[in-house]
Amino acid sequence: MTLGLKKFLADNYGKRVIAGQTVTPGSNAEIDAITRETGRTPAMRTGDLMFCTPSKYEGTKEYADNEVAAALEWGRNGGIVSFGWHWYAPEGKSDYYADTSTFVLGDAVTDRDISMADDEELKTLQESGLISEQTVLLLKDIDAAAEVLDKFRGENIPVIFQPIPDGDSSMYWWGGSAENYKWLWKLMFQRMDKYHGLNNLIWVWNGSSGDYFPGEDYCDVIGQSFYENSPSPFAGRFSALAGMTDVPKLLAVTNCDRLPSPDYMRRDSAMWSWFSAGSGNCMITNNGELSEKYTSWQNLHDIYNSELCVTLDELPDFEEYAFQEE
């Protein structure tokens, strides 16, 4: 099914935009509100692995388990499953924001290739002083995230995976140093792809600066976040990202406050692969109703009922789609 989803994304690219929605962990509240108001349902459900790592899981077990269960059900019913990963730091004052976390990524960076090391080898390397405790803790978190993603592989459900976003913004503990960020990204990619065999992942790198780009071999899609309360398709940034690689990559709006207009995308030749609006008050009130804080009812209705917008009911069976002829 992963090949089928990749083929669908490639075939659809430049023609229509796929509707996605980020959800409150463990629920489909935002999606339910959109369906009620427009009669159409987002094709993509975007969750987050933030509660699934050891430093957070015990205190947020219900959220984490409900989130995984909801995403699995979404995938079983033919929807596109997507996960971000706002990674709570593995030690110290645990948060993902740099100004409230005490974790220092530079303390974990090593020149050694540890992507295939098992627990015993990691223990030996740490006891020998060849890698730090912080290095081991990072790998434990990556392994915990991989364990969650493996549940989807086991059910032949592809996952659009967009971890550690906006590294070039210095907002998060994984940002601030391009070299450290790229080291972490490549470690995570190799650990999940080679060590854990997660061949169901479609990798999305989110950022603006080429200095932080890990390389064409380490991602399938380049994503961008927009928090500018504008229906603009941001054609300038679309062009800039398109020029970042020699091998063309799909481009996507991985998070936004106000939904971009598909009509403007077509007008400006900036047809992103998908959009995914932010969760919570970006879309709904505390009562689960449409908030209209950023996107009005009329705009939401127009976007979701546009011929340029792909909704859940229009998705193919990805297993069959993989073998369809052009």
Where are the regions that the model predicts?
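N-terminal module-boundary/linker segments of secreted carbohydrate-active enzymes
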Residues: M1-E62, Y304-E326
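Alpha-helical scaffolding within the catalytic cores
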Residues: L3-G4, G26-I34, D65-A69, A144-V148, ...
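Loop/turn elements at helix/coil->beta-strand transitions in domains of secreted/extracellular proteins
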Residues: G14-V17, R40-A43, R76-V81, G154-I160, ...
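Substrate-binding cleft of secreted/luminal carbohydrate-active enzymes
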Residues: V17-T22, K249-E326
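Aromatic-lined carbohydrate-recognition surfaces of secreted/lumenal glycan-active proteins
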Residues: G20-T22, Q162-I164, D168, W185-D211, ...
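Aromatic- and acid-rich polysaccharide-binding/catalytic face
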Residues: R45-G47, S209-P231, G278
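Substrate-binding cleft of extracellular glycoside hydrolase catalytic domains
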Residues: P54-L187, K194, L198
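Substrate-binding surface in catalytic domains of secreted glycosidases
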Residues: Q224-V253
